């Protein structure tokens, strides 16, 4: 086997034709042992040549040796029946086993050294007993043999057979001199470790190779007698290497050949280790022991001492902290190497700045503060992610059902945060002060109050009518607390903060999901080629795999939907169906609103004449039934409309359902503000609060029953009775509209029932776990995978308009136009709720220190012109932002098309280059041999596959030449 030097040229290769063949091959041979990519390298696990020599007289596999492991049974071996008690070449006149044997260092065939190479000769010697002899059973070069290497039909290019190669015995170099004095390949040599068989084990045969001190065999252990007594080489190491060396060809050679040259070779790491006594010269002399043929910047060791590493460190020192961190972060290194690089750069920077410490004191302080700020920010971010609600649950849901179903639970958690904030505000500034002056409740609690909200709860902090209108002052001359201002400012602050939070959230999600360049590339590179290697837990790995699979299906579905095109008739048909569905849904919504209004009036008249506590539940029960049944009827329209894109179907259902629910809430608000508030009822604010509480509670009960009973029964029917139904899919539109409807009621009732955010918080917390369990048990993943990156943005938009804006309009009418109750609430006795603000401003106008507050109110808050100018500015900024967004979209689209065109240009050039190379190969087929050698040298791991499979390219070229001939 040739020993190719990766860092040398072909003229320095011992197997190259015309190589002079130095008698001393020790250095060149050993130099290849630490070349991991050399096909014949001892350290190459894919090398399949033998390590154990069954022919050596001193080998441990020799049957005469008392520790023999195997006995060869080939012709001419001691185990063969026809063996004539000789070990040397059958034509040798002096066999070593004869008593009168004398070492003969002359060649045992005639005129060996005098024979020169002739072009007409075959590629291998043909003397008697040689592989090249025509009469030899295992001949390779005989034209009559089925497998000669010089035959055109034989495509095995395992070893070169040109003059000067190891397989050619006419080569004048020492490797082919099997009978050269002192050669290991000479059968007459007493210390030989290999057989006279040419190229039997791929070992060096140069003179004196056996004199290397403690020279190991190919198992990492010497094969001379008594080797097992050494302290350096233990049997455990030998057995370990033996296990690695047993490849697909066995120990003795190829399965289809008569020569032992196909045995797999393992690493010589133990042999080359200086600790074993044997010091490989190449081990100590390599140009780069760590990374001999790679970039030093990517090396795992001593990278900082290389010129490239020093240059990198020198370039990082003058950088700012931000740029230095960004540069180190982008380095293709492990985290440990990046930390070491940062420490080295910090040390170098400290050395350079040691003399100018006083001058750079401020800069160092700023750098330290910046570093502390970044670390604190990172720690807080990690803490928030760690304590984030249901983080693991979200990963499971997203991995199994995709981002579309996950968007519902993300929206639910987002609403829960809103209600937690509102409850904290109300509890801190309204409820706690009222506890200090509240009177004891004398009503009896019966339990029915949980459903009706009346009775015992009427005289608690739950409703508006219980709060005092006085100024709280615990001692004379102390600080006072105006309950009227606290009530209206706290409710107003909650609504204002919710307003800006909704705007900020819509802007953030809009920027991430609508202006993201991934809408053109879809993040394919990140999706396919990125893997979080910090994920090591088996369950987490499987979950990550599910996530990747779901995201890939979502991206593929979008690509397929973009390529679908409809004909004109199909478009007209679908348009007609959509118009009809919209007309039917609008008519149903109008009918439901009319029914709810007349039911509310009838129920109010009925309650005046009947004192039945359960009668108050009739209106919320009917409204909840409508909200449960009508959206399911809307969902059946999908069978007729047949939307190809699932996102469009969800959008249409959302709009229809929100139109239904908001219309019902609007009719109820009209009834409350125009019928109940003007009816002269005692404490009408508390009555409205009770109605909203009952609506919210009844909606929660219906949702709970639908999840625990309805969805469970639907699963049983689909699995047991009507199997064609199978499992149902999660209805995102209907479930999201339930959340929006409940949150609308919570915002609407926050003025009349300050504890309503707390009730909504409890219901959302329970609904998450109920929906999660029902989802895992009763639903299947969506049949059409689709991404829902823009769904949360649409949900928040629907929550903002018309839900939140409708609530603001209703509360504005209540505060500015309606008269408060005369006997209850903090605003009792006032002509309007806003009158408390006017009285406060009048009081501040008589105090010189607060005149700036009066000016702000009169010229900004209370001025119509200010709000007109502010609205105009907001619209202008929105328009400019929209134009910038559209411009960026166009630029992103152009850049994306440019990248695609550049890729097409490269593919065109590659195809042209490939065609030119094919034409050149057909014109000069001999270049295929050198190309094969380059492939073997560059890809040693595939050497076994290349040897086992024929060279299809060579066969194709030869067939074309034969056809032309």
Curated annotation (Swiss-Prot):
Biological role stated in the UniProt entry: Probable component of an ion channel. Molecular function hasn't been characterized yet.
Extracellular compartment residues: 1-417, 468-484, 600-613, 679-691, 769-794, 881-965
Superkingdom of the source species: Eukaryota
UniProt subcellular location: Membrane
Name of a matching Pfam family: TMC
Family: Belongs to the TMC family.
Protein name, as recorded: Transmembrane channel-like protein 5
Membrane topology qualifier: Multi-pass membrane protein
Gene coding for it: Tmc5
Region annotated Disordered, chain positions: 1-235
GO cellular component: plasma membrane
